C-alpha cells in the first residue's frame, strides 16, 4: 500500500522533502509505503490517542502507569478495568435509524446493543419514539398524498406542532441583534411547515389535474375549486409574509404551464423554477423537515420519561456528546502549516465542535455550510430561488468561495449561524459526514496533502 502524504520534514536524501531556496522547509508531496499490518497499527494508534473507540480494558505501560502514591511503577504492562462505554459506531447508526424512522433497522440495532430483549420492549420502543407513525407520515408525503399525511399528523400529534411560532426571547437571549435577525429569517423559511404542506398539496392538485387525459372538460370547475382552496387554506398565512405570498403566486403560475410530452414540439417548455416545484425531491425535503419537527415535539416527553426512570431506553435522539466533543489535540500538530505557508488556527480540545469551527473568520463562514441544515435561503430575491434551494441541498460547492471571501473581504454572502439547540434532530452520523467534508475542504483549501491509496 502506497500512501501519498505531504512531508514537512527534511530528509537526508532530500528526494521527498528538503531545504527550500531560502533555507526554509520545502513542503512537497512524498510517498511512504505501509504493509497492511503497519497501516492497521497506524490506524489503531491514532484511534486510541483520540479515544474514538471505548474498550472495557486499557493496557498501560507500567513505566508510565501512575500508582496510588503518585509515582510510577516498573517497566512492563498491566491491564486495568474501566467503565464499559457504548460502542460509538453502533450508537451512531441507531441514532440515524431512529431519527430517520427506519423501524426494522432501529429494532435490529437496538437488539444488538441490548436495549430490546423481547416483543414487549419492541412495542414500548416504538411507542416512545413514534417510529411507525413518523415513517407512515413521511411515506405519505413522498407519495404526494398530503391531505392524508396532515390528517395523520393531526390525529397523532395535532397540527399545531407544525405551526410553531418564533420566540425572540427564551433560548435566544444572549444573542446579538444580527444573530436574532438571522434566526428570524431562517424561521420564516423553515418554521411554518403547515403552510408548506398546504402549498405542496396545492402543487399536487395541479399536477394531478394536468395529468388527466381530458383536462379541458372540467378545467373551469377545477380552477374555481383551486382558488377557493387557496382563499380558505393559504390566503391568511400568505398575507402574513412576503415570502409566503411569493411562494403561493409561483405555485399558482403552474396553471399557465400544463404538463406536456417532450415529443410535442409545439408545447411550451416549463421554466426551471416551476420544474423544481414538480420535482419529487421537493416532497422528500419537506418530509424530512416534518420528521425533524415531530422529533422536536416528542423529545421533551422522551427526556421526561427517562429522567423519571419510567423508560428503560436511553435518549437516542441526543447522542453521546463524546462523539462530537472528542479530544482532537493529537491531530492538531499535523495541521499547523499548509504547504503555502498559511497558518491554521490551533483548535482547542476543550471546546465543542461547533465552537471550534467558529474560532476564526474563515472557519466561521465555512461552519454555516456544513452545520446549517438549510440551504442559506436567507436574502433570496424570489420564491423561485426559495423552492430551488428547497429541492437542491448543495452544501459544498460554495465552500471555496466562502473561505476566500471571509479572509478579510466581505462579499455579502450571508449564512445563518448554527445553534445546536435549534436543530439538533438531524442524525449525528449525517452531521459527522458533513464535518468530514468540511475538514477535507479545509485541507484542500490550505494545500495540505491528504493520504490516498494508490494502485
Curated annotation (Swiss-Prot):
Source organism superkingdom: Eukaryota
Annotated InterPro entries: CRA_dom, CTLH/CRA, CTLH_C, Ubq-SigPath_Reg
Primary location: nucleus
One Pfam family recorded for the sequence: CTLH
Region: Disordered, residue numbers: 1-21
Localization per Swiss-Prot or TrEMBL: Nucleus; Cytoplasm
PROSITE patterns to which the protein is assigned, alphabetical: CTLH
Function (record text): Component of the GID E3 ligase complex recruiting N termini and catalyzing ubiquitination of proteins targeted for degradation. GID E3 is regulated through assembly with interchangeable N-degron-binding substrate receptors induced by distinct environmental perturbations. Required for the adaptation to the presence of glucose in the growth medium; mediates in association with the substrate receptor VID24/GID4 the degradation of enzymes involved in gluconeogenesis when cells are shifted to glucose-containing medium.
Quaternary structure, from the entry: Identified in the GID/CTLH complex. In the absence of stress, the complex exists as an inactive anticipatory complex (GID(Ant)), composed of VID30/GID1, the E3 ubiquitin-ligase RMD5/GID2, VID28/GID5, GID8, and the RING-like subunit FYV10/GID9, awaiting a substrate receptor to form the active E3 ligase complex. When cells are shifted to glucose-containing medium, the substrate receptor VID24/GID4 is induced and becomes part of the complex, named GID(SR4).
Protein name per the record: GID complex subunit 8
Organism this protein belongs to: Saccharomyces cerevisiae (strain ATCC 204508 / S288c)
GN (gene name): GID8
Amino acid at each position: 500500500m502506497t500512501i501519498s502524504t505531504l512531508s514537512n520534514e527534511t530528509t537526508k536524501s532530500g528526494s521527498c522533502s528538503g531545504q527550500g531556496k531560502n533555507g526554509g522547509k520545502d513542503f512537497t508531496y512524498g510517498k511512504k509505503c505501509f504493509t497492511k499490518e503497519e497501516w492497521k497499527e497506524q490506524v489503531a494508534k491514532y484511534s486510541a490517542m483520540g479515544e474514538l473507540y471505548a474498550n472495557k480494558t486499557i493496557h498501560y505501560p507500567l513505566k508510565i502507569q501512575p500508582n496510588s502514591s503518585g509515582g510510577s511503577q516498573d517497566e512492563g504492562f498491566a491491564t486495568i478495568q474501566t467503565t464499559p462505554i457504548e460502542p460509538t459506531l453502533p450508537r451512531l447508526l441507531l441514532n440515524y435509524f431512529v431519527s430517520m424512522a427506519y423501524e426494522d433497522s432501529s429494532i435490529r440495532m437496538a437488539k444488538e446493543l441490548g436495549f430490546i430483549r423481547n416483543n414487549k420492549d419492541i412495542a414500548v420502543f416504538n411507542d416512545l419514539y413514534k417510529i411507525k407513525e413518523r415513517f407512515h407520515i413521511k411515506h405519505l408525503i413522498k407519495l404526494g398524498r398530503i391531505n392524508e399525511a396532515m390528517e395523520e399528523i393531526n390525529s397523532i400529534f395535532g397540527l399545531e406542532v407544525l405551526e410553531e411560532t418564533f420566540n425572540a426571547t427564551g433560548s435566544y437571549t444572549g444573542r446579538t441583534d444580527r444573530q436574532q435577525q438571522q434566526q428570524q429569517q431562517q424561521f420564516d423559511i423553515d418554521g411554518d411547515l403547515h403552510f408548506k404542506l398546504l402549498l405542496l398539496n396545492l402543487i399536487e392538485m395541479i399536477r394531478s389535474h394536468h395529468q388527466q387525459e381530458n383536462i379541458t372538460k372540467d378545467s373551469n370547475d377545477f380552477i374555481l375549486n383551486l382558488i377557493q382552496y387557496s382563499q380558505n387554506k393559504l390566503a391568511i398565512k400568505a398575507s402574513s409574509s412576503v415570502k409566503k405570498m411569493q411562494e403561493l403566486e409561483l405555485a399558482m403560475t403552474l396553471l399557465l404551464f400544463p404538463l406536456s410530452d417532450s415529443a410535442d414540439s409545439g408545447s411550451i417548455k416549463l421554466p426551471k423554477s416551476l420544474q423544481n416545484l414538480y420535482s419529487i425531491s421537493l416532497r422528500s425535503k419537506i418530509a424530512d423537515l416534518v420528521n425533524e419537527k415531530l422529533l422536536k415535539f416528542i423529545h421533551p416527553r422522551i427526556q421526561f420519561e427517562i429522567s423519571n426512570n419510567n423508560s428503560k431506553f436511553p435518549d437516542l435522539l441526543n447522542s453521546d456528546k463524546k462523539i462530537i466533543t472528542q479530544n482532537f489535540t493529537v491531530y492538531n500538530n499535523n495541521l499547523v502549516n499548509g504547504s503555502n505557508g498559511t497558518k491554521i488556527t490551533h483548535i482547542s480540545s476543550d471546546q465543542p465542535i461547533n465552537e471550534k469551527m467558529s474560532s476564526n473568520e474563515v472557519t466561521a463562514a465555512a461552519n454555516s455550510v456544513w452545520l446549517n441544515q438549510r440551504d442559506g435561503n436567507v436574502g433570496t430575491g424570489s420564491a423561485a430561488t426559495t423552492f430551488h434551494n428547497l429541492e437542491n441541498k448543495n452544501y459544498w460547492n460554495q465552500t471555496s468561495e466562502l473561505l476566500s471571501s471571509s479572509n478579510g473581504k466581505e462579499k455579502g454572502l450571508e449564512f445563518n449561524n448554527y445553534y445546536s439547540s435549534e436543530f439538533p434532530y438531524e442524525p449525528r452520523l449525517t452531521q459527522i459526514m458533513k464535518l468530514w467534508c468540511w475538514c477535507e475542504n479545509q485541507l484542500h483549501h490550505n494545500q495540505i496533502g491528504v493520504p490516498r491509496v494508490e494502485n
